[in-house]
Amino acid sequence: MTIQKNWQELIRPNKLHVVPGSDPSRFATLIAEPLERGFGQTLGNALRRILLSSLQGAAVQSVHIDGVLHEFSSIAGVREDVTDIVLNIKDISIKMQGEGPKRMVVKKQGPGTVTAGDIQTVGDIVVLNPDLPICTLDDGAEIRMEFTVASGKGYVAAERNRPEDAPIGLIPVDSLYSPVRKVSYKVENTREGQILDYDKLTMMIETNGGVTPEDAVAFAARILQDQLNVFVNFEEPRKEVATEIIPDLAFNPGFLKKVDELELSVRSANCLKNDNIVYIGDLVQKSEAEMLRTPNFGRKSLNEIKEVLAQMGLHLGMEVPGWPPENIDELAKRFEDHY
């Protein structure tokens, strides 16, 4: 037995399916299937921990408020005390280019609410939640705050953000650098061929908008990959790749793809299976009338299949010369490896 069989013969996900949320830059559901049994929990837990703790982001490190000496002060004409203001500042979401530290300032007169959108930023800093309230000013009140922003990862407590030579009046802030706000996942059974107990991993991710959920998972997977490399204590033997002659076909090689790859609804997929329609080449030769004569196959399934085929530049009722070819299963496998 070659060592490569330890990983080459495990089933791997066909692809990552991304379902965007109401705001695709912040919310998404990602689905990976099929996975070997147990791998859904293993990968889901590892990715969740990395997403919440290890991705780089930006956050406020400290704030200086004119006329304020420490966080237990109050400010004339400002309804919130400084402790509450600092808690609100901690929730400011920021996207920053470069390392920092950098400065941003807010100055406002009352009456009214000071929000994160009032902050004056330089071109390489973007406030991602401008509607966040920071404090409320009465008539005649005025406030000026200067923030120090830096990049980092995970969570850093306020005390660790206090420089040794901190001037009087500099108030450190808890920093939540991670651009990922929430991650949850679930593992369900899924089917591949005749095997019913593979894993399906579904991850629900919310970010602050500084990175998309899809990119966040990609970064987390890359971190995990990099950390695991140290455990690989061998080099794979070089595989001699023989030059394979790919035969010329009288039809589109795409017809050799299986209809399972079309991501149809369960009802439509089952109808095709029951009618022994395995390959796209089998499907496109069928007319609409033939399809509607298939048991349990209705107009809704027909429209679904027509739409999917149209996206591929195909349609029902096509003539496919030379279909089905001899040794179709072998041909399908060979073209799967090359296209």
UniProtKB/Swiss-Prot annotation:
Region (Alpha C-terminal domain (alpha-CTD)): 251-339
Protein task: DNA-dependent RNA polymerase catalyzes the transcription of DNA into RNA using the four ribonucleoside triphosphates as substrates.
One cellular-component annotation, GO: DNA-directed RNA polymerase complex
The protein's enzyme class: transferase
Quaternary structure, from the entry: Homodimer. The RNAP catalytic core consists of 2 alpha, 1 beta, 1 beta' and 1 omega subunit. When a sigma factor is associated with the core the holoenzyme is formed, which can initiate transcription.
Family membership noted in the UniProt record: Belongs to the RNA polymerase alpha chain family.
Coiled coil: none
Taxon lineage: Bacteria, Pseudomonadati, Pseudomonadota, Alphaproteobacteria, Hyphomicrobiales
Pfam family, one: RNA_pol_L
Record InterPro entries: DNA-dir_RNA_pol_insert, DNA-dir_RNA_pol_RpoA/D/Rpb3, DNA-dir_RpoA, RBP11-like, RNAP_asu_C, RNApol_insert_sf
A biological process from GO: DNA-templated transcription
Reactions catalysed according to its record: RNA(n) + a ribonucleoside 5'-triphosphate = RNA(n+1) + diphosphate
EC number(s) given by UniProt: 2.7.7.6
UniProt protein name: DNA-directed RNA polymerase subunit alpha
Keyword Cell inner membrane: no
